[in-house]
């Protein structure tokens, strides 16, 4: 409203008061108005023309306080609504008077927060008592069938018409509060005294702040047109509940429809607080951040109401669209004595080109104190929480406002800012805690990896190979994560290469094992006599093969006891152990012992024996033992162990043997024993090579997996067999007649017995080539069995 209009209205108001004092009407009886009798005697004070202003009933002039607020009122002066016509003609005013005279409560719909500068709060319930009595009288004569909004068209065109209201009557833009006030008046309870309206934004007028909401237009349009629009279209005060079919939009399509539900809250007015000055109290809504700032108030309290400084609310920067369908019978407010109401703040439709995120707005806390003359019997401490949201269809803005109101004091109540929202410091602390936990977990895993790698393990002793390869890391060096990861990678690669090599070696060993197993199975399943049984030696003369291998033909070693080891030889006395892996089918040939004995396997051996026999001829000897080759080779001289049927009769006669021949015979016997021991040793090693091919490369290693003796015992047995062979050859040399002539040999033997045994075995042994045959036989067996010199370890 422009200042000229405002000043003119103030002048009109003062003129009406002076006129009422100087020219009281004849119908105006102050006593009648004080006790509430006969209110129909005067014109309705809501709308009075310029000519009828002199008949306005005023009982007395209200006393004006220090700030221009009247201290007491009569019924006429305290009646809440006055219509001042400055430019309207008398006929229009009278027509309005005739339409509204029967509906005095219609004027409650009008709102103008900038005109009523002379009215103020009451300090008693005197006016409410009078208002209740007059309301009961008018309720019987008021006709609800008359449309209260018919007046809006005539009032809408009046530019200087201003309708004021008393600040203590409750106003609700949805009709709920007016309905509550009307019900209170008709039920003799009266409206809630000393109440004001609380919103999100406050402005201050010249001398008085009146509660209102700029619902349709901006604050610059807060004039009579604004008040008439609210009266004519938005608030269905009385017909909203009784006649829901009537809506402001149906009466006037120019007014906007309801799209959002606005809300205001009723708060009891606190006591006067002269310590607080509201001259600098301002609230602003920032378009960029939507934060509510209060420059004139200390934090966190953003506003405190008092009886002298009422708070008016508007939205100067945004337009508000109200909901189309207001609740009819809903009442969001509890009884006044509880003073605990929860409503939603008005929702504004904000047009903005920026894209905002969801913003939680922290609003201030407002504390108020109830008046002593209020309806509550005893003061009670209660708080009211009001939350509002501002949403925009174009940009996702969410704004919530929270008010905590204390009804019995002026101290602000509410939670601290840290409890409302997490501060950036607390968020940063939570983030740091998560990062610290992540780092500690990572360091633990790195430490486990360091202990798993041998080159990084604590207390690891490096070898020369590690130092040469450069894989050793000194313990004094501080390890970092990069070093640990690199060494772990190298260790994994080395394990992979070793694993690959072991897999290849395992394949080779599996192949060899299959070959050895097949050889052993072939030797055991041969149709000839098994080697195990041949080692025990079957008794008697077993006929052998006619075809003897060349390697066996070169051997001249053999005794009758050797037929247990080599049954396949042409003669048991001249056989050499044969590999059991070369079985041959037996050839049964009917041969006489004479024919078999005439077979000489080795020429050199025969020549040697012929020399011995020519030197020491023996005509006949029954003492020829089983180990004598001469008796077998020359049965005519020695007779041997032949059957009597095959030996001539003259051979059966006893013959004389010289002592020299007897010594020679004994020497030959010792020699034959030595040869037999060597042959047995060869057979024993051959069996071990067949049963344990892994140890075939070394002649000193035998894993006795088959025989029930340990490897150490086998080594001792082998050494004893060799020693026995040496002794046999030594005894052969010493017992011969030629040996007795060499006394120096005996002295050497007595002095160096052990050395003499080995020397005599290697030098003085006549069949020294037998050792060569033994080595050749062993090499032949190894080559034919496809046995390598050893297995790589």
Swiss-Prot record:
Span of domain bHLH: 426-495
Alphabetic keyword roster: Cytoplasm, Membrane, Nucleus, Phosphoprotein, Transcription, Transcription regulation, Transmembrane, Transmembrane helix
Gene3D superfamilies according to UniProt: Helix-loop-helix DNA-binding domain
SUPFAM superfamilies linked: HLH, helix-loop-helix DNA-binding domain (SSF47459)
Compositionally biased spans, kind Polar residues: 323-334, 342-351
Subcellular location: Cytoplasm; Nucleus; Membrane
GO MF assignments: DNA-binding transcription activator activity; DNA-binding transcription factor activity, RNA polymerase II-specific; protein dimerization activity; RNA polymerase II cis-regulatory region sequence-specific DNA binding
Compositional bias (Low complexity): 376-400
Transmembrane spans: 719-739, 748-768
Phosphoserine found at: 344-345, 355
Any Pfam family: HLH
The protein's name: Putative transcription factor sre2
Native organism: Schizosaccharomyces pombe (strain 972 / ATCC 24843)
